Amino acid sequence: MMKMMRNKPTNLPTAGMTNGGRGSGGGGGGGGRESGGRDLEIRPGGMLVQKRNPDLDPVGPPPPPMIRVRIKYGAVYHEINISPQASFGELKKMLTGPTGIHHQDQKLMYKDKERDSKAFLDVSGVKDKSKMVLIEDPLSQEKRFLEMRKIAKTEKASKAISDISLEVDRLGGRVSAFEMVTKKGGKIAEKDLVTVIELLMNELIKLDAIVAEGDVKLQRKMQVKRVQNYVETLDALKVKNSMANGQQKQSSTAQRLAPIQEHNNEERQEQKPIQSLMDMPIQYKEKKQEIEEEPRNSGEGPFVLDSSAKWETFDHHPVTPLSSTTAKNNAIPPRFNWEFFD
């Protein structure tokens, strides 16, 4: 096939000589051209065809001539040059500049009928120098204002949700860091956990205050679920942290009380149990203390001897030694075996 494709251009002068009666010199000078003087080209299938010139090929039928229409708005006439194949919507957009009315707030009346923006001029019978009337539509204007407010509200809600999402992402990073610390056996300050929970709850309040519809509502719902999941995770970490702190306090308290308990156990072992009231010794220590602590002079002030006082004499009796009385007081009474009767 490649050999055939290469050989075909070499045989062109011969074909030209047979068709046009020219010699080989004329064929060589033509450089692969036909008698008409047009270039030839080989298609991918190997067919030799005449080369096309895109500049000479007709694109389509010529466009129709422009028409001029007159539009009355109030007491003023506006002349607009436009193609008859254009639509009334395109004509309204062209009237926005001269009249200052938004194209959605315009009504075009042609032959006492309101024309739809999608209708074409030539189909509706509009010709050159046709007349129309432009009327401002208050209902359309109100609808457009409501739509603009709705769009602005949606954009504002979307921006607010986007800002909240960034803040939730930042707080989510802290929650992940807390989880890693807990998994490694570390401890987290309860103050830090409470602070992050409060920040997440603030973001949740902001999300609840946003009123949205459609896709923005779905975005808000997704962010609410994220915040709730983070709060639940922090609550679980808070419980684990409090349990760990409680166990640590119990262990430290047990370590402090261990020597005290050992001392109490030793004292209990040293004490002997009292089986009956008869085994309990009678104590005379209190009586002895009262006797010894009683002062000789119970009066107030220093003792003064009066020389004029009359003294009465008594018979002398032998004084019992103090040691014997003290010994008697300190002596423990004998124990008796008492017999009880019903």
UniProtKB/Swiss-Prot annotation:
Ranges of biased composition (kind: Polar residues): 8-17
GO MF, any single term: protein-folding chaperone binding
Signal peptide: none
All residue ranges annotated as the BAG domain in the record: 160-238
Domain of life: Eukaryota
Region (Disordered): 1-41
Matching PANTHER family: BAG FAMILY MOLECULAR CHAPERONE REGULATOR 1, BCL2-ASSOCIATED ATHANOGENE
Name used for this protein in its record: BAG family molecular chaperone regulator 1
Gene encoding the protein: BAG1
